[in-house]
Amino acid sequence: MKSTNRKYKVYNFVENCQNVNYNIKYEILPHKTIEKNEKTKYNKDIGKKFGLMEVNKMLCQFTVKNFKSIRDEVTFDMQAAAISEHEDRIIKDKDEELYLPVSAVYGPNGGGKSNVLEALHSLVTKVLRPLYATSNNEEIAMKMKKLVIEPFAFDEETRNEPTEFELFFRTAMAEYRYELTVKKEVIEYERLDRIKLETGRKSALFERNEDEITLKGAFARLKTSDELSDTLPLLSYLGITYSKNEVVQDVLDWFDEEIDFLNYGNPMQELRMAVSKSEDVKRLMLQMIQEMDLDIVDFRVEEKENDRIEVFTKHVVDEYEAELNLFDESSGTKKLFGLLPFIAKSLLRGTTLVIDELDAKIHPVLLKYLIMTFSNMEKNKKGAQLIFTSHDLSTMNSEVFRRDEIWFVAKGNRQNSKLYSLVEFKNKKGESVRKDAKFDKQYLEGKYGADPYLRKIIDWGTVNG
């Protein structure tokens, strides 16, 4: 699986549609390839123009194939495209590479957008779960719950083929590319490559092809067991056996500390995990609550028996103070308190936060506020990233997003989910979607092909070919 550069998928749309009052105007065509020196010049120009901050940790790109509704290879990219809008909202890494602070995935219910995020979650959990196998910590158990890696079910061939993952990420030390191929929990292929940021030197660290394992470069002197389980990732084994190795630690710290997923489906547990004793987290939460113009001025947490907690909010209305139990608050406020600690921690630490159906948790006005907070480099000083799925179209506009921050997922008539970015769309004249276009309006009109009632006007036979 190769995903070194930004990928562009080609989708063919039927222009003259029967029983439809409008025509599809856009299709996805390959962009012009940006040469390395051209891209570097663009990145340096942006950095000089806006003086963007430098960060060290980043999710760069994720690719998956044959996972649940995803049959064919799809790539989700957090690398900024060379486009002109909102150039002050880009995260700049130490070697002038530019990354996105926010990405939203849109699409109909059942279209597969959650599966894109679940695929990433499944990969991270597959690596980390063995490291915490003996832990009795309830929070860790909740985070490390087993996620079943299932192949695409609507094709006889793919049902018997492995699922393929590829993850491209950065730490303060290096850029890593990790590949994992899994079939019925068994590891068929695994590889880890590294580029040291200080020298730019690229090297392979290990390669595993079924039972054959080769350790290279910084791992050349490490040893593996002849009885290594075929369901245990080699990366996990190295983390257990060589936890003090600098490179092993650097890689696994990213998996463990630099990316979080929020979709546990258990509100009480979620709240207990969210509420933090950190004064920095509380201070930032209160700042955000005030900026949202809510009348909560403070809150406190009481720990109860059986690992229960109660949260009390302090309100001031017309100079009158009152304290309420969080469970007496509106559902929106309760959802906000389950969410804001994760947001605050991500902003303070500069981590990647992945949330399924973020819009279901909060009001559209607050959703816009959170998106703009991550996009504001004065507030997002550590280079945190927010990735989420959404149905909310009120934020799908050029004020809130760059075109490369908007993604769509849609299913074809073979139930195969396709993932594509708004920046990839081109019309027949080779023109991109305008940066000042009304994205939400064009989406509803079917010009981006990710709405269920538009399936009949998309030539999915050609797409799925």
Explain the meaning of each model-derived region:
Residues Y11-K32, K39-E54:
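Short, positively charged and aromatic/hydrophobic N-terminal segments
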Residues G47-T125:
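Pre-Walker A-like glycine/lysine-rich segment at the N-terminus of P-loop NTPase domains
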Residues L98-L147, L336-F337, F342, T373:
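Phosphate-binding glycine-rich loops of NTP-binding sites
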